[in-house]
Amino acid sequence: MARVTVEDCLEKVPNRFALVLMVAKRAKQLLKGAEATVSTRSNKYIVSSLREVAMGNVGYQDSLDANEAIRQIEKDLNK
């Protein structure tokens, strides 16, 4: 995959907002040392996260409402 686009990712995620939340959380996991599921020449965690979503390696879980998701992201970012 030469370039990853938002449209590639939206085939796997219900909307752009969910995509942003999911990619941000995954990028933070990669930053903390999680192993990437795709091989990439890029050291950018956001790009790696987007590639993982586009390839279907990272799943979307629709169990949190929007407010709970925002609180969880804020909590994760403050760690």
From Swiss-Prot:
Keywords (A to Z) from UniProt: DNA-directed RNA polymerase, Nucleotidyltransferase, Transcription, Transferase
One of the record's GO molecular function terms: DNA-directed RNA polymerase activity
The UniProt record lists the keyword Chaperone: no
Keyword RNA-binding carried by entry: no
Catalytic activity field: RNA(n) + a ribonucleoside 5'-triphosphate = RNA(n+1) + diphosphate
Pfam hit, one: RNA_pol_Rpb6
Gene3D superfamilies: 3.90.940.10
First-tier enzyme category under EC: transferase
Biological-process GO terms, alphabetical: DNA-templated transcription
GO CC annotations, alphabetized: DNA-directed RNA polymerase complex
EC number(s) stated in the UniProt entry for this protein: 2.7.7.6
InterPro entries attached to this UniProt entry: DNA-dir_RNA_pol_omega, Pol_omega/Rpo6/RPB6, RPB6/omega-like_sf
NCBIfam families with a match to the protein in the record: rpoZ
Function, in words: Promotes RNA polymerase assembly. Latches the N- and C-terminal regions of the beta' subunit thereby facilitating its interaction with the beta and alpha subunits.
Homology family: Belongs to the RNA polymerase subunit omega family.
Subunit-level organization: The RNAP catalytic core consists of 2 alpha, 1 beta, 1 beta' and 1 omega subunit. When a sigma factor is associated with the core the holoenzyme is formed, which can initiate transcription.
Protein name as catalogued: DNA-directed RNA polymerase subunit omega
Originating organism: Bdellovibrio bacteriovorus (strain ATCC 15356 / DSM 50701 / NCIMB 9529 / HD100)
Phylogenetic lineage: Bacteria, Pseudomonadati, Bdellovibrionota, Bdellovibrionia, Bdellovibrionales
